[in-house]
Each structure stands twice: as structure tokens, then as C-alpha cells.
Design a protein with these regions (language model features):
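Bacterial N-terminal signal peptides that target proteins for export
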Residues: 2-12
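Intrinsically disordered, low-complexity repeat segments enriched in small/polar residues
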Residues: 6-7, 19, 514
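Hydrophobic helical h-region of N-terminal Sec-dependent signal peptides
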Residues: 12-18
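C-terminal motif of bacterial Sec signal peptides marking the signal peptidase cleavage site
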Residues: 21-24
Length: 658
């Protein structure tokens, strides 16, 4: 069987997702049916992400032209025919990733070898409230000429909201007063019933200490520049009875977790809430949310702050685990110790009783922008069973906190992640979809639809990561035009066979990677860092229909440039006591125009019906290693062959050079 997977399937799936993101709310970007078809040489699918419009600004994003007759170097944005500016200059003011991306190409990777990336967002400012505007976008060529106009997109700013200052309810920004009650009262009073024009809770000033807070539909929480929302270090301020279950499973019930610092949860959470349970929530501002999870310094005696490649200060948090949390943690220590005092086993207490920064469940239309996210006791931002989610211009500073993912999407639909800076203690952007038979029994929805672009991934276990919870499938993910520098992995897919489901329809293109600490590409079902008891799925997990295109990788210090693994029926039976009817293998992976330099060799097994077209290596002897593969095609200047090998019949081949 030959691989027939191409970009059209993934492109179509993403187009459907983008339509949902644009039509999320009438007040934050008009639905896309006001557009006409644009010429192929013009930018495509211009839209305003749901809830990205406020009373005086809005955000535009778009896709590349379908065809480029000339080299595109930038994009120009027009409002009612008046030129507002160009995307790259605009991002200097609104994207924390942009200066790092510029520095990467100017200083870190200055020899011109790396894949260049496109920047495709624009923040329009100085707008009037409750006013409709018409925008078009043009591609700008190297000679300064411009493409035809995109289709016109019409979008309306929001009405001017009523503003509730947190201080009016007695909140004090002195860093010591516990403000939970005052802040919650401000939030509870901020309703459309009281303020039909919309309502915003504003936290401004200095450092506001608080326990768990709970948001509701149709509101904005803004943390102003200079203000910090600091998590209390007292477990009692995150009451377990207000917490949540990760999944609704009954065969192997999940333990209840405490609430996060910021929450959107039903009062009696049962492990699932459909999107639309809550609606239209914005969490924005130029301030900071600090979870107060860990002490400073990656190790004891280590630097609390380092100076990064841009000369900026980056906080460093303790790399720890269940055995060392008592010495290393703050909130993480106190929550774990409190759970152990209740009689919970120490590893379970550590895994299940630490608070994340945000747990946002069942939200239709969710917008996060501008904030700095720091030091969670557990995860960073978790968006569960939600729909139409945008993360724009966040700064994630959680390195090297244990389990400190940047953002995790679970069983959600339609996500946009752009202009973010990631320096995280775990995965930067992670996707999850349940595990085991429970994903089918409880009819969990797949994690479906994501567009990840124009981000700077600095540190993290993986930049773009799927799994290990793959039970209901993770699908329709596009990651393009990102820079990945010093992450452990670039594209990481992970699961365990009995978790089931898998990952499908992924497009990873036009990304630049440098100094990757481990593997640039990982596809593994032998993930062992997160083991959960579960009734096994009917079929073993699988990764399929993945396209990697126009990517450069310069430098890996430790492991394989591409790692793909699986397991035989016998291995799964021996390791997990589960007998499946087939091996756990992957299929329809296509790498095209991918260049490696100064990397380790590949290690590829349990792969079927896949292609490697114009994949080149510099300074990597014997770059290809295949075994237990079926109909894998190599097509480059050295090879034109299809490879099929048994498990004990490894073939080693030299790699082509560019």
C-alpha cells in the first residue's frame, strides 16, 4: 500500500476548525461568511479570533497565499482601504516572541541555513467601541510590491465594558493580605445581568495574594501591567471539594484534584463539562500570574535568575520530584504534605494533589492574551472540553518546575496558539484525549483542531506534543512558522499501547530548530513517565497521517534525529498482559524537504506505508536505520527505494546531503 496522504486532508480539517474560531462570538470578529474568495496570490482566510476584539482594538490572523509568484517577505493590513502598517513591525509591539525570533535569525542562526518563517498576525488599535470595520491584507514582496487584496473581513469591536476595580471590594496589593474573598466578590458581581454592555474585573497595582478563584460566563479578568496575582501557599485556600476530576471514568475512577489558582468549573465537577457550559471568557492583561509552586533555582544553590540570549532575565524554578518536594516546593510541598497527612500514599499525593495555574473546563469562546505565566505547583494553563480557544502573546516562564507544561488542551476543539514565548519545565503545547477503554465508554470527544504559529519555543520537554493520553484521538493539528531553540524535542508524539486511539492528521511545516537537547522528532508508544491504571483500549495506539515539510534542524546533542518505535503482539502481552490482534505500528508518515545538520542518526521501526522525500543530513554518518518496517520509501539524491524489513533485519544507509 502506497502512502496517499497529502496536505489536502489536513488543510481541509484545519479550515473547518478556523471557521469555528472566527465565528465564536458576534462581538469579537464577524463570521467568515462575509468573505468572498480571494485570488490565489493573496493572503487566505483572514479572520478575527473569537473574543480577540475589545472596545478599541482587535486581532487579525490569516493564512499564506495559495500560490506565490514572488517571494513574500511581509504583509500589509488595510482598514477601509487605508494602510495601517505591516505585520512584522506591528508584532514588535504586540508579540513577546518576535524579538526572540529576530535574534534567532540575526545572531543564533546567522548563516542563513535555517528555514525562514512567515509572521501572520496584526493588532489593529485606536478603534471605536461597538463599531464595524472592514479589513483586507496583502502580501508584500521583496521588491516592495504588493499582492492583490485578500477577501474583505468585517469585524466589530465590543461595547465599552463596565470596569470593576478589585480594590473597591477591599483587595490589597501588599503581597501578604489574603484577597480570595474580595477578588471572588468582584468576580461574582461582574455579570451581564448587572452590566448588559459587558463587564471587566481589573486587578491593578502590585502583588495580590489569593487562593482559588472561579470565573463565570461573559466576563473579562484583566491583570494590569505591574500587577501580580500570587497564589497562596496554604492548601486550605484550594479546597478539594471545589476541585475537579480529570476524567469521568468509573472502571478506574480518577482522584479528585484541588482547584487551580484560576478556574472555570461546575460546582459539582464530575470529570466532564461540554463546551458551552460556560461562554465568552477573557483572561488578559500585561500583568503576571504566579502560582508560588516552587523555590527558585533549578537546583539547590542554583541561580534564581539567568540572563537569556536576548539579555533578558529569566526566572528559574526548582527541578524536583515526589521524593524531593519537601525540600524544593512551596505550594507544591504544602499540598503534598497535607495529602500525605490524610493518609494518601506519597506518590499519589504528589501526582494528584498539586494545583495548576488554570483549569478552564467546558468553555465556548475563551481568549487569553498578554499575561506572564509563572511557577505553577503542577501544570500551567489547562483548557478541557472547551471550544474556540485562543492564546495570543503569552509569556510562559515555568522552567524547570516539575510537570510545568505551558498549555494543555484536553478533549477540546479549535485552538489557536500564536505569538507566545515558551520557557517551560515540561511540554510547551500539549494535547490530550483520555486513555483506555474509558475514552470509548464515556464517549469522550477527540482533541480536534489546532493552529500553532509564530511562537518561540525556548526550553521545554517538547515544543509541540501529543499524548500520552491519546484514547479519543488527537487530530487536525497544524504547527507552522515557529522557532524551536534548546527544547528537548521539536515534534513529540507519545502514548502507551493500551491507551488506544492515537494521533492523526498533523501538519508540521516551515519550522526552524536548533540545539535540540534530545530528539527533534519522536513517535513513541513506550512512554513510561505517566502510567495510569485503566481498562485497555480495543486497539493499540497509533500515529498516522502526519506530514513534516520544509523544516531545518541544526544540532542534537544526545539522541536520534528521528525516533519511531512500536511493539509486537508478543511484547505487549508480556509487558502489559494485553493480547492484541496486531502489532502496534504507525503509518502514513511523510517527511519532505527536511534538512538535518550536526545531528545523530535515525532509529525507525514499526512504520508502514510512509515516505522520506529529500530528507538530507550534514555531518551524520550512516544516518538511516530501519527495522520492522513495511513499504517505507526513500527518495533523494542517493536513494530511490522502498524498504521492507523484519524486526531482526536492520538496514543501515548513508544519508543524502543537500
Amino acid at each position: 500500500m502506497r502512502n496517499t496522504f497529502g496536505p489536502s486532508r489536513s488543510m481541509l480539517a484545519l479550515a473547518i476548525a478556523l471557521a469555528g474560531l472566527a465565528g465564536g462570538c458576534n462581538d469579537s470578529g464577524g463570521p467568515r461568511d462575509n468573505q468572498q474568495d480571494a485570488p490565489a496570490s493573496a493572503p487566505q482566510n483572514v479572520f478575527v479570533p473569537a473574543l480577540s476584539a475589545d472596545e478599541n482594538s482587535l486581532v487579525l490572523v490569516w493564512e499564506k497565499p495559495e500560490s506565490e509568484t514572488e517571494q513574500v517577505v511581509d504583509y500589509a493590513v488595510y482598514r477601509q482601504g487605508q494602510r495601517l502598517g505591516q505585520a512584522r513591525e506591528n508584532q514588535n509591539h504586540f508579540s513577546p516572541a518576535k524579538p526572540y525570533i529576530d535574534n534567532f535569525y540575526q545572531r543564533v542562526a546567522s548563516d542563513g541555513w535555517q528555514q525562514k518563517i512567515d509572521l501572520r498576525s496584526f493588532t489593529a488599535t485606536n478603534l471605536q467601541p461597538d463599531t464595524e470595520y472592514a479589513f483586507t491584507v496583502r502580501a508584500v514582496y521583496a521588491d516592495g510590491k504588493e499582492s492583490p487584496d485578500s477577501a474583505v473581513i468585517k469585524a466589530r469591536t465590543s461595547k465599552t465594558p463596565h470596569i470593576i476595580e478589585a480594590s473597591t471590594f477591599g483587595a490589597k496589593g501588599d503581597g501578604t493580605t489574603l484577597n480570595t474573598q474580595a477578588l471572588q466578590q468582584a468576580i461574582d458581581s461582574c455579570t451581564v445581568a448587572h452590566y448588559p454592555q459587558g463587564c471587566k474585573v481589573l486587578i491593578s497595582g502590585s502583588e495580590f495574594k489569593t487562593g482559588a478563584l472561579f470565573l463565570h460566563s461573559d466576563m473579562t479578568l484583566e491583570i494590569a501591567a505591574g500587577a501580580t496575582l500570587l497564589g497562596s501557599d496554604d492548601p486550605a485556600h484550594y479546597p478539594l471539594d471545589k476541585g475537579y476530576y480529570l476524567y469521568p471514568y468509573s472502571d478506574h475512577p480518577q482522584p479528585r484534584r484541588p482547584p487551580s489558582l484560576i478556574n472555570v468549573l461546575e460546582a459539582a465537577d464530575k470529570g466532564e463539562s461540554p463546551a458551552g457550559t460556560f461562554r465568552n471568557i477573557r483572561i488578559v492583561g500585561q500583568g503576571t500570574i504566579d502560582g508560588n509552586g516552587w523555590t527558585r533555582g533549578v537546583k539547590s544553590g542554583g541561580e534564581a535568575t539567568i540572563i537569556d540570549e536576548m539579555g533578558n532575565a529569566l526566572p528559574q524554578y526548582r527541578a524536583s520530584n515526589a521524593k524531593k518536594v519537601g525540600a524544593d516546593g512551596i505550594l507544591a510541598k504544602h499540598q503534598t504534605e497535607a495529602a500525605i497527612a490524610e493518609g494518601i500514599e506519597s506518590n499519589s499525593a504528589y501526582k494528584n494533589r498539586r494545583s495548576s495555574l488554570m483549569t478552564l473546563r467546558g468553555v465556548q469562546n475563551l481568549y487569553l492574551a498578554g499575561l506572564t505565566i509563572r511557577n505553577p505547583a503542577f501544570h500551567g494553563v489547562m483548557a478541557l472540553e472547551s471550544e474556540n480557544i485562543t492564546l495570543n502573546g503569552l509569556v510562559h516562564q515555568t522552567f524547570d518546575g516539575n510537570n510545568a507544561d505551558g498549555v494543555e488542551f484536553g478533549n477540546s476543539k479549535n485552538a489557536l496558539v500564536f505569538n507566545n514565548f515558551f520557557d517551560t519545565g515540561d511540554d510547551c503545547v500539549n494535547f490530550a484525549a483520555g486513555f483506555g477503554k474509558g475514552a470509548e465508554t464515556f464517549h469522550q470527544q477527540p482533541q480536534s483542531g489546532a493552529w500553532i504559529f509564530n511562537n518561540y519555543f525556548r526550553k521545554g520537554h517538547g515544543a509541540v506534543v501529543t499524548g500520552s493520553h491519546t484514547g479519543a484521538w488527537i487530530e487536525n493539528v497544524r504547527a507552522e512558522d515557529n522557532v524551536m531553540y534548546m527544547t528537548d524535542v521539536g515534534l513529540r508524539m507519545k502514548s502507551r499501547p493500551y491507551y488506544g486511539g492515537g494521533v492523526r492528521d498533523v501538519l508540521f511545516r516551515h519550522n526552524a530548530m536548533k540545539d535540540i537537547a534530545k530528539e527533534p522528532f519522536v513517535f513513541t508508544i513506550k512512554y513510561s513517565a505517566d502510567v495510569n491504571d485503566t481498562t485497555p483500549a480495543d486497539e493499540p495506539a497509533q500515529f498516522r497521517d502526519v506530514q513534516v515539510q520544509d523544516v531545518t534542524v541544526d544540532g542534537t546533542s544526545a539522541k536520534h534525529s528521528i525516533l519511531i518505535d512500536g511493539m509486537t503482539v508478543a511484547e505487549m502481552a508480556e509487558s502489559f498482559g494485553v493480547t492484541y490482534s496486531r502489532d502496534a505500528y504507525h503509518q502514513n508518515l511523510r517527511f519532505s524537504n527536511v534538512s538535518f545538520r550536526n545531528t545523530k542518526a535515525t532509529n525507525i521501526s514499526f512504520l508502514h506505508d510512509s515516505q522520506f522525500d529529500e530528507v538530507t543530513f550534514a555531518n551524520t554518518p550512516q544516518a538511516w536505520a530501519f527495522f520492522a518496517v513495511n513499504d517505507v520509501t526513500l527518495a533523494d539524491s542517493l536513494h530511490q527505494q522502498s524498504i521492507t524489513r523484519e524486526e531482526n533485519d536492520k538496514i543501515i544507509l548513508e544519508g543524502a546531503m543537500k
